[in-house]
């Protein structure tokens, strides 16, 4: 199918590139969840079984609950990034705003992935920069806490802005953002 608009702007190509990058980052976040599953396995087993009944023993730091979070949490963040990438194209988001929102969502996803892994190595689970009733702080606490808090606040604004574009923007674009979108150019998708 050819694009009926021969003067397509570079903005569509830029947003297509952003979407592909976001999907790639989301996939890598999901990959970290799978790696977290190996950490969970080795923590529970106290090592790795190389053949039936033969275990190479070693200590994997963290807690079982922490490794469960490492195995499950990044999946939600990966899906957040991928769904945002796929959904943003259906909203009348200007190119500059789309880039800013997209990268804030990606960085929030990665900061949360870091929170799960670094928090598992922290005495206070990465919930504070100092000593609290949960435990003492260390360098892992800082690495878990700071990026998650910074990007956690930024992503709230990013999703509020996306909500605005979806619900209240008066300049709703009647045209699809990409030729493969549902109903693009009056035809079914490929």
Give, region by region, the residue ranges found by the protein language model.
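C-terminal or internal capping secondary-structure element at the end of a domain, subdomain, or sheet
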Residues: 140-184, 190
